[in-house]
């Protein structure tokens, strides 16, 4: 099976974001992608579909999610500036993370297409959990591919998926992480697409997946924009979200992209440091290439081979990134920065200690950047409003954090009061 770009025919929606995106897939998958794109366009133009989706978002997922202003952080120093940090609470979505937003959309779409089986991949287990609960709700078979390493470090989510009736398949090949789970899911879909829908969990993959995922997640920024205007009377100065594959971030950025006065920042996993060889900062430190059917930035070695990515957070441990993020970086519309494991762990503890919220380690990367920007603003005499996508809750990470801090006591938060 060879992979080549789909050069035949045209797509209904733009397949590229600048030079990034496309459909670099086996020819046997092109009919499935064409069918999916047509079904998505038809569905989003259907008032009945939009009404049904809106009902699930409201009555099952609990949308709109709240906007919480951090009120107890010990930030104020000697500077004359003042920073306000607001959290868009995607951790309060049913399922525990932003993932369920677009999963409900895709499962409804799959049912509309007559599919009876859903295939998914998962890293931290949040996407797999969201897919499993949506399939349980709508009576569809669910198969989840998960890297063997991730199965080991995310046992609670594995059991949750199984409770919902999903079959979880550990992937031992390669590095045993998210990249390898995606490969196996794509192989399955290639063989079974007549009855199966591949529910991709991030804003990457071949067209039309990046567009579908963005559109179903755009509700995050649509709500947040309205909430910020109501609460503060203006748009935020900075919007920050963590970026692995980039789904929560593109949902958080989407409605702000045309607002040039709003700075967009993606927090990538710098792991043990950008020079350590152990990180997943694809845009900050990667090269352009093709992975999982799309042209974007990748973690690649000097031979051009895709490298293993690394992050303390399983959900950010992906060696590629969505093509729209690559385009936002290339055009300068968004900035992408590396946040280390140590910085994320500090932010995790900070939010728990001072605001009573336990964030996912993924979200902790975004919050760590917000803390840095807030401190700098106050030192430099700036007044700054920062909006953070709190993309998921941290229940799944508590044991991992506890073990890590026991092994590295120097990272335990010192009380700043």
UniProtKB/Swiss-Prot annotation:
Domain of life of the native organism: Bacteria
Task: Please verify whether the record's keywords include Transferase.
Answer: no
The cofactors required by this protein are: pyridoxal 5'-phosphate
Catalytic activity field? (1S,2R)-1-C-(indol-3-yl)glycerol 3-phosphate + L-serine = D-glyceraldehyde 3-phosphate + L-tryptophan + H2O
Alphabetical list of Pfam families matching this protein: PALP
Q: Does the keyword NADP apply?
A: no
N6-(pyridoxal phosphate)lysine PTM positions: 99
- Give UniProt keywords alphabetically: Amino-acid biosynthesis, Aromatic amino acid biosynthesis, Lyase, Pyridoxal phosphate, Tryptophan biosynthesis
Cite the SUPFAM superfamilies for this sequence.
Tryptophan synthase beta subunit-like PLP-dependent enzymes
| PROSITE patterns hit by this protein | TRP_SYNTHASE_BETA
Q: Which family does it belong to?
A: Belongs to the TrpB family.
What HAMAP family does the record point to? Trp_synth_beta
Q: How does it assemble?
A: Tetramer of two alpha and two beta chains.
Function of this protein? The beta subunit is responsible for the synthesis of L-tryptophan from indole and L-serine.
According to UniProt, the name of this protein is Tryptophan synthase beta chain
Species this protein is from: Corynebacterium glutamicum (strain ATCC 13032 / DSM 20300 / JCM 1318 / BCRC 11384 / CCUG 27702 / LMG 3730 / NBRC 12168 / NCIMB 10025 / NRRL B-2784 / 534)
